[in-house]
Amino acid sequence: MAWTKYQLFLAGLMLVTGSINTLSAKWADNFMAEGCGGSKEHSFQHPFLQAVGMFLGEFSCLAAFYLLRCRAAGQSDSSVDPQQPFNPLLFLPPALCDMTGTSLMYVALNMTSASSFQMLRGAVIIFTGLFSVAFLGRRLVLSQWLGILATIAGLVVVGLADLLSKHDSQHKLSEVITGDLLIIMAQIIVAIQMVLEEKFVYKHNVHPLRAVGTEGLFGFVILSLLLVPMYYIPAGSFSGNPRGTLEDALDAFCQVGQQPLIAVALLGNISSIAFFNFAGISVTKELSATTRMVLDSLRTVVIWALSLALGWEAFHALQILGFLILLIGTALYNGLHRPLLGRLSRGRPLAEESEQERLLGGTRTPINDAS
């Protein structure tokens, strides 16, 4: 069945906005500008402020939900039910996980390459699978266990590529290792978030845009308030601002004033996460969760290719091998081999229900992509 123009538009929107989301965050990190009080030129390293911006983008999904609800007010068959019972506090625990995981990933993005950042996020499969067995009572089939093992192997190869790559003065080997480990740690938290959402949220049949928007609201408010104590908490060498504190939002705004292109990068990050979530949800609804997963894998290729073209990182053949192994692991875990085996076995009907399964991130993406 050929795709309609609308489906092609959604697929393109998801691919483009998902790529912009990671690349714009890395672009902002690469800028150098003076800070407040005439401080010397330094890198724009404000991961927690960037996380606040990401949650602002997710929060905008709530506005999109209410617009859809107003438009569908007179439609009895609409999926946006005005009378749907809803307790926003259900989203507080997942939002706290989202806030922690997102902040860790933005910190890690300052330390490692955009392509490694995107590839290592595939580790979420490992922890989601293990946690779903432990806390949701789910039984994984052989192909899912093989997918987890392949994902572990892929992560090792990608990490090895980072170790063997040439490192400039901006990204020392110790920083790259720390950044990669932070990304893995963040995926543990993201996996906890997904398990919490499945156990306590999905059974209430909350509209995905409302779910994303509500978590964005909690994350935006809580992390914005935390910026105040972060301004005073010393962080030593871990800090990227002149004052040596955990976060210096005032320094960030001064840098934006000195270099307006930083604002362009931040706006790109904020707007892209909103459109990416909308496009991802729509792709799952209009096409399938499998299609969404394939597009997310293509996004990694786009990010890697553009990072090479822009000179942000050096080419390393091991990254290709690592990405292919990660792709195989993701495909095995999510059952993409079943349609292929169905076609190979003559006359055997394809299992269409596998297309409709909610895969990892099937209803939302936690960082930049997600998630």
Curated annotation (Swiss-Prot):
Record GO biological process: negative regulation of mitochondrial outer membrane permeabilization involved in apoptotic signaling pathway; positive regulation of cell population proliferation
InterPro entries (UniProt xref): SLC35_F1/F2/F6, UCP036436
Organs and tissues of expression: Expressed in pancreatic ductal adenocarcinoma (PDAC) (at protein level). Strongly expressed in prostate and thyroid. Weakly expressed in lung, heart, liver and kidney.
Residues carrying sugar: N110
Signal sequence extent: 1-18
Positions bearing Phosphothreonine: T365
Annotated Gene Ontology cellular component terms: cytosol; extracellular exosome; intracellular membrane-bounded organelle; lysosomal membrane; membrane; mitochondrion; nucleoplasm
Pfam families the record matches: SLC35F
Keywords, ordered alphabetically: Glycoprotein, Lysosome, Membrane, Mitochondrion, Phosphoprotein, Signal, Transmembrane, Transmembrane helix, Transport
Topology with respect to the bilayer: Multi-pass membrane protein
Coarse class of the protein's main subcellular location: mitochondrion
Localization in the cell: Mitochondrion; Lysosome membrane
Region annotated Disordered, chain positions: 352-371
Domain EamA: 104-160
Membrane-spanning residues: 48-68, 89-109, 117-137, 140-160, 176-196, 216-236, 261-281, 295-312, 317-336
UniProt-listed PANTHER family: PTHR13146, SOLUTE CARRIER FAMILY 35 MEMBER F6
Protein family according to the UniProt entry: Belongs to the SLC35F solute transporter family.
Assembly: Interacts with SLC25A5.
Function, in words: Involved in the maintenance of mitochondrial membrane potential in pancreatic ductal adenocarcinoma (PDAC) cells. Promotes pancreatic ductal adenocarcinoma (PDAC) cell growth. May play a role as a nucleotide-sugar transporter.
Name this polypeptide is given: Solute carrier family 35 member F6
Gene name for this UniProt entry: SLC35F6
